[in-house]
A protein has these predicted regions:
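Extracellular Ig-like/FN3 beta-sandwich strand-entry sites
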Residues: 128, 192-194, 232
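Surface-exposed loop/edge segments in extracytoplasmic proteins
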Residues: 157, 179-184, 218-223
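Secretory targeting and sorting signals
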Residues: 1-29
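Short tryptophan-centered beta-strand motifs in secreted/extracellular beta-sheet-rich domains
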Residues: 42, 131-133, 193-204, 211-213
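Short, solvent-exposed beta-strand-to-loop segments that form ligand-recognition rims
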Residues: 215-236
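Beta-strand acidic-aromatic groove motif in beta-rich domains, primarily in extracellular
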Residues: 141-149, 207-210
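Low-complexity, Ser/Thr/Pro/Gly-rich disordered linker/stalk regions
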Residues: 30-129, 135-140, 152-153, 161-166, ...
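Short, aromatic/His-centered strand-loop micro-motif at the edge of beta-sheets
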Residues: 175-196
Length: 269
């Protein structure tokens, strides 16, 4: 009975995948489907701690002017309420130096980030992955929210499922190398309202995957990702500021919200 339920869940996931279904092989269609991160992971702080860790995987800084803060005892910038994760960026008025990551911008904000404890790795055992969630994303100049995958041991690989850079356009990006990038830019009506962002990732050869990108259930693009097979990736939700999203950023607090984030995969053995 358990095997039958798993198969039914896989069939349902494939049906929702739309164009991605054609990329599935008969072997993968016969696999079982399993949940890696359930939509309930933002229900309370115990559920959050079981599936997510605070900050970026590498620490507090990245490529913008916000430094990430958050812990089990500090919820000023990473908080939960009613099943919704809220990241809050607040401008600071003191000198906190520069970011430890290139391009080493001056720190002008405190903000929040979380990353999943489980990693996404496409291989023979787990050839298909679904990564999705509902988000209210800021889109004012200087705001840089993201929902993305990036390499654990090297960069690239990278897949940006949600990325707004100071306007109402979402950037679906797939980095194969630092200079070999596919970008599909899609205008989103009212990014600050709830929208669903989704990636369906499927193994298509011994080394490569296809990544299908969706907004609100509508297929937007497929990117061919050479060399992604076997490379573990972190899943990150963060609110960075300025940098590629322009400056100056807002003086008032900025909020980025997420709910019903889900990660699932097919298992061949």
């Amino acid at each position: 009975m358990r095997r039958r339920r798993s198969l039914l869940r896989l069939v349902a996931a494939i049906a929702v995948a739309g164009p991605a279904m054609a990329a599935l092989t008969p072997a993968s269609a016969a696999a079982s489907w399993e949940t890696v991160i359930a939509p309930s992971s933002f229900n309370d702080y115990n559920a959050l701690a079981a599936e997510w860790a605070y900050l970026y995987p590498w620490g507090s800084d990245h490529n913008g002017s916000a430094r990430m803060y958050g812990s089990a005892t500090d919820h000023n910038h990473v908080s939960l309420s009613g099943g919704v994760l809220t990241l809050r960026a607040a401008r600071i008025n003191w000198n906190e130096g520069t970011s430890g990551s290139s391009p080493h911008l001056p720190i002008r904000y405190h903000s929040g980030a979380v990353h999943a404890r489980d990693q996404v790795v496409v291989n023979d055992q787990f050839p298909n992955w679904e990564v999705k969630g509902d988000f209210q994303a800021p889109s004012a100049r200087g705001t840089w929210p993201a929902f993305w995958l990036t390499g654990v041991n090297s960069w690239p690989p990278e897949s940006d499922i949600l990325e707004f850079k100071g306007d109402n356009r979402n950037w679906f990006n797939t980095f194969r190398t630092s200079s070999d990038v596919d970008s599909t830019i899609v205008g989103v009506s009212s990014p600050g309202s709830w929208h669903n962002y989704r990636a369906w990732i499927t193994k298509v050869s011994a080394t490569d995957v296809d990544i299908h990108y969706y907004i609100d259930g509508q297929w937007k693009a497929v990117h061919h990702a050479r060399g992604f097979v076997g490379k573990p990736m972190w899943l990150i939700i963060n609110l960075q500021m300025e940098g590629s999203s322009g400056s100056p950023g807002p003086s008032a607090d900025t909020y980025y919200r997420a709910r019903d984030v889900y990660v699932g995969r097919s298992r061949n053995y």
